[in-house]
Amino acid sequence: MITAAPRELRQLPLYHDIDIRGPETEVATIFENIYQPWGREQFVRATAPVIRFDDVPEEWRGKAGGIEIVHLGPVDQECDPGLVKAFPDALIGLTPQGFMREWPNNGKVQAIEWLGARELLPRVSALVLSAEDLPKSPRGQEMLQEFIELCPIVAYTQGPRGCTIFHGGQATRVPAYPAQEIDPTGAGDVFATAYLLHLRKTGDPIEAACFANAAAACNIEKPGATGVPTLSEVEARLRLTPLD
């Protein structure tokens, strides 16, 4: 993992077996999520520095680095798009929400145009984004269509309605799996990670979406990071009948 975060966060037991690189900082990026009947309100309370190409360890770069999968996951404009150049042979996954938001009024997050999409997306293997990442105006759907034209695989997540996979000129709806929701925070991150892992394993964008939907369903049934499921939990969820 490459991140910009304080030492105390890197030393949490949750990360004891993860190789964490990147600059140690005084503050971490902090969000506050408030879930309302009409959707999520989000606020930025603190921001960490930008992560740049030079923060990638030299031994991880290029063909010699042997990195097979990269998940570029900006949350608040903190990832330099040039990071993808360090991994020329990897499957590159992108969750772009951090490129598509600003927080001008008291830290309240709002959707904006992603001006760098046309340059970055042709270098990306799979794009994962949610309905919440896009503007609610008609421009939101226009942006989605532009992304579909620029990236070979787009996974558009829609919460309890599952997701739609855009690939090869086709749109395939993949239903969600049953779940008793306790905490939806982080479900998108779990979906994206599971999707990229299974896409790398199978090469099948639709099969990967089924796997990722099952992982996300498991995740929302527990609070916080405790909800990250095991492989056996995901496989058990896959044996259930998806929601129609």
Model-derived segments and spans:
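A short, aliphatic-rich alpha-helical micro-motif
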Residues: 64-65, 121-122, 148
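Conserved N-terminal subdomain of the carbohydrate kinase-like
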Residues: 1-73, 77-78, 83-93, 236-244
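A polyampholytic, Gly/Pro-enriched intrinsically disordered region
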Residues: 40-49, 111-123, 174
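Short, acidic/turn-prone active-site loops that include or flank metal/cofactor-
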Residues: 25-26, 96-100, 177-180
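Conserved beta-alpha-beta core of the PfkB/ribokinase-like small-molecule kinase fold
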Residues: 69-144, 161-162
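Conserved phosphate-binding/catalytic region of the ribokinase-like
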Residues: 140-244
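A structural micro-motif
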Residues: 18, 67, 90-91, 124, ...
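Short, charged, surface-exposed secondary-structure boundary motifs
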Residues: 29-34, 101-107, 181-185
